Amino acid sequence: MNLGRCPLAPRSANIVLPKHDAVSKQKEYRIEEKTNEAQREEIITWKDNREDEGEVKTDFEVVNNENIITTTPKHQTVITPKSYRKSVKRIKHDAPQNEDIPVMKGLAPINADTESKAESMAAGKVLGSKNSSQKARLQEWKRQYKKAFPHFRFYLDGCDPSVAHRVKKQIQQLGGHVETFFSGNVTHVATVRAIQDVSVKYAKQDVITKARQLNMKIWSMEKLCNRVLKTLMENDQCTTNAPTKQGNDLSYLLYVEKVQGTNERDLSVPRQDFVHFRGPYLYVHDIANIYKPILLREWQKPLPDRDVPWPTFRATSIGRCPFVPETKYRLSTSKSLVAKNDQQLLQRQSQEPSLILRANSMKASLPDISNTGISGMNTNTTYNTNINNTPQTAISGITQDTSPSIRTNCHHCLDDGMQASGIVQSNLTSAAMSNNSAIRSGSAASVPVVTINGRDIAELKKRIIQQKSGMIGKDYSYKAMLHNTSQRKIRVDAKPGYCENCREKFDNFESHIRSSRHRRFAENNDNFKDLDELFALVQRPLRPD
């Protein structure tokens, strides 16, 4: 009999077994508890006898004979003591002949519930191990992709602008780049078209065809958005949403600056990717970013006492350039001329009704002298149409010249002062030359004789002279105004520029073209020989006669 350790029990429990083979062969057993005093005494007596013989010393004791049942990994139940002292060195010895020592007689039967629980635990362990391995693989994939993402350059083919803006922001957050145009620098092409269908053939100049020829990665937008970016951004979103202790950590701030760029707002801090304008500037660039900026200029801030050097809109007169400042003298002159013209227009409008009333009164006061002869200077002088009494002299020529003016309508005489004055002069001349003689008219028929008093003619002459003097006064004032305006010295602003003929800059255009150097070049015909030859080539030929 050997005193050893039970192979199915804990290492610290020392149990006496009759034979080890009996443990594996028994199928059923009963746990018998001996709690009477006789059995206790027998155990104590056996212990004393063994100590007296000096064969073995053991600390094994049964305390109140209380045992517990423990489950081993192989689902076997054994009896172990509840409490024990420190283990001692195990020595092989023969088992005592007393068969009353408590021994383990068999294995406990396996319960169905215990077996199902054990199976579920085993399955859970297998699934847990699989999940842990998948998580480890996923973390490794994310680590590798995040490391390589700054070297990726994407080109989005046929993507919606709103979606493209969101995807571009996420790619830049991970350190990648989005190319505006397709080129050889692109590493990945993301498209909304079906790329799995091999039967579909695209044109030679198509982006998909070019990408396949250059061995680029071709991804669908679904893969890029829902699988790659979503997986890589999960931890980033969690860390940004949750409060972290690394908010002020230097390594974290350096990482954010590397991915998103610097957040510095101070204009005095230099940056590698931006140049800040410090003053007024003019910047004309291509909105599609195809060409470089067309025009770029920056002006320095002027001193308080000087004008601004950059172009600004100014209040100028009509026809003047709004960017060229106009002198105060020109502005005051233009304003005064406008005010004077407005005043004259108002005066003309106010004088028009009075002139109309005066003309109507003159028409009403004059008698109707149409188609009649007019008497001479004397009141009793008459124009007779008797052919026999009229001599054949040079008076007939005068009569022919004066008869049309005599027969004009009196209304026309009132409208035009010159015509009216001509009528009066011709009447007076004809009356003086006739010397109370009869003047023959153009027709042989009798014409009625009309007698006009000298008082009416004098009044008509007086009114015509007054009207003529008024018109002359107005003409004189208008001509005087024009003469004063022409004599007034007009101030011309200096026009600076560059003369390509003289190859020099000038401050005043008028003074430069009158300079000796410019005139010497302009008067030399050899300088314009090439230009004359060009004009001769493009000249239109004359039509042959």
From Swiss-Prot:
Cited Gene3D superfamilies: BRCT domain, DBF zinc finger
Protein's GO biological process: DNA damage response; mitotic DNA replication checkpoint signaling; positive regulation of DNA repair; positive regulation of DNA replication initiation; positive regulation of nuclear cell cycle DNA replication; regulation of cell cycle phase transition
Pfam families assigned to the protein according to its UniProt record, in alphabetical order: DBF4_BRCT, Dfp1_Him1_M, zf-DBF
Post-translational modification as stated in the protein's UniProt record: Hyperphosphorylated at the G1/S and S-phases of the cell cycle.
Residues that, per the record, bind Zn(2+): 499, 502, 512, 518
PROSITE patterns for this protein: ZF_DBF4 (PS51265)
Coiled coil: none
Keyword ATP-binding belongs to the record: no
Origin: domain of life: Eukaryota
Zn finger spans (DBF4-type): 492-541
Main localization category: nucleus
Compartments, record wording: Nucleus
GO cellular component, one term: mitotic spindle pole body
Subunit field text: Associates with hsk1. Interacts with mcm10.
Record's function text: Activates hsk1 kinase and is essential for G1/S transition. Has a role in S-phase checkpoint control induced by replication fork blocks after nucleotide deprivation and DNA damage.
Protein name in the entry: Hsk1-interacting molecule 1
Gene assigned in the entry: him1
